[in-house]
């Protein structure tokens, strides 16, 4: 029996808790061992509801509980989350997180902590939500030399661009509709300026090429300057506009960047519309492989988190090589890319 604690009961954390409770029999079958929810840390515990028996208001209760084997971090950000994840790893507890900012900015530090304490930190849900990408990239494609990983990594921007090209909406109208439908935050800066996609691109680059990439080292350009003229040009040329996060090798140089692209309508990524995400991998033996599906949302993201939990429980004693090495060789300048 493995005991799980969740830190953070927002959209994703609540989804994880629901899945752990309602799918307990299925999870036991797939993991080969019973997985039991033991505690949920939240700053605002409620006295009623299905999660009330699990609430704790002090993370120390989780950190110091010898029965808790694994901590799920769904707080977000890189301040409190970094503190809690570091403490969990030092306490000898495995960690599963969906936090792309945490991994992109502090991955090296956390990988070293996990290794030093003989535990795992897994983060499949940090890129493309419910789409299995990181595990296939590092395991299933392990016989391949990866040459490029390109992706539509942000559903908000993909929805906006789809509305502009398919329905003739202006950027402002498409953004307003995205906010009304809950696809965009009240402050959409991290999405529309490419910051969210950049964090995910850093993770993909680290896993694909084994070298650390910091978000501040890559060229980032969002979609806020895409206008009706761009949409008309794309349509006239039989193309689509997509905000892509790309990491690739070209002429012996490694590039990593985020920017809007004109792509042919026949390209694999061209047919991925609305809030969907997709990642296209180019590899030496299999050629092009496309992973596509819901890249965000309560249950898709929670599904990926629980998948990592099962992976850890199913393989007791195996400490996986997490992430990438400490080589801080910055990617080549975007100006050199052709």
How should each PLM-predicted stretch be described?
Residues 1-91:
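N-terminal glycine-/serine-/threonine-rich beta1-alpha1-beta2 phosphate-ribose binding loop
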Residues 7, 73-75, 98, 105, ...:
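Structural motif
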Residues 81-87, 91, 100-138:
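Rossmann-fold NAD(P)-binding glycine/threonine-rich loop
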Residues 94-96:
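A short hydrophobic/small-residue beta-strand
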Residues 139-204:
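Conserved anion/nucleotide-ligand pocket segment
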Residues 175-271, 276-278:
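Substrate-binding/catalytic subdomain of NAD(P)-dependent oxidoreductase enzymes
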Residues 289, 293-299:
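Glycine-rich phosphate/pyrophosphate-binding beta-alpha loops
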Residues 304, 309-338:
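A conserved regulatory-domain signal marking ACT and ACT-like small-molecule sensing domains
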């Amino acid at each position: 029996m493995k005991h799980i604690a969740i830190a953070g009961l927002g959209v994703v954390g609540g989804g994880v808790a629901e899945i752990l409770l309602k799918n307990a029999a299925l999870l036991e079958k797939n993991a080969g061992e019973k997985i039991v929810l033991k505690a949920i840390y939240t700053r605002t515990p409620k006295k009623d509801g299905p999660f009330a028996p699990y609430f704790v208001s002090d993370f120390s209760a989780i950190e110091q509980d010898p029965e808790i084997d694994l901590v799920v971090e769904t707080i977000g950000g890189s301040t409190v989350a970094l503190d809690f994840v570091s403490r969990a790893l030092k306490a000898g507890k495995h960690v599963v997180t969906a936090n792309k900012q945490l991994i992109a900015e502090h991955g090296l530090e956390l990988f070293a902590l996990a290794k030093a304490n003989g535990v795992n930190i897994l983060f499949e849900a940090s890129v493309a939500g419910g789409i299995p990408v990181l595990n296939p990239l590092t395991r299933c494609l392990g016989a391949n030399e990866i040459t490029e990983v390109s992706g539509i990594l942000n559903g908000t921007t993909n929805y906006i661009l789809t509305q502009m090209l398919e329905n003739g909406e202006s950027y402002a109208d498409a953004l307003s509709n995205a906010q009304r439908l809950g696809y965009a935050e009240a402050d959409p800066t991290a999405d529309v300026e490419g910051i969210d996609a950049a964090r995910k691109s850093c993770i993909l680059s680290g896993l694909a090429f084994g070298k650390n990439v910091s978000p501040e080292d890559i060229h980032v350009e969002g979609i806020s300057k895409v206008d009706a003229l761009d949409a008309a040009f794309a349509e006239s040329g039989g193309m689509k506009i997509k905000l892509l996060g790309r990491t690739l090798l070209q002429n012996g140089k490694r590039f990593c960047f985020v920017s809007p692209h004109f792509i042919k309508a026949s390209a694999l990524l061209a047919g991925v519309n609305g809030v969907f995400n997709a990642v296209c991998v180019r590899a030496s033996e299999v050629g092009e492989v496309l992973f596509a599906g819901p890249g965000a949302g309560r249950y898709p993201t929670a599904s990926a988190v629980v998948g990592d939990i099962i992976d850890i429980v199913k393989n007791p004693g195996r400490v996986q090589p997490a992430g990438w090495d400490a080589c801080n060789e910055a990617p080549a300048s975007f100006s050199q890319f052709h």
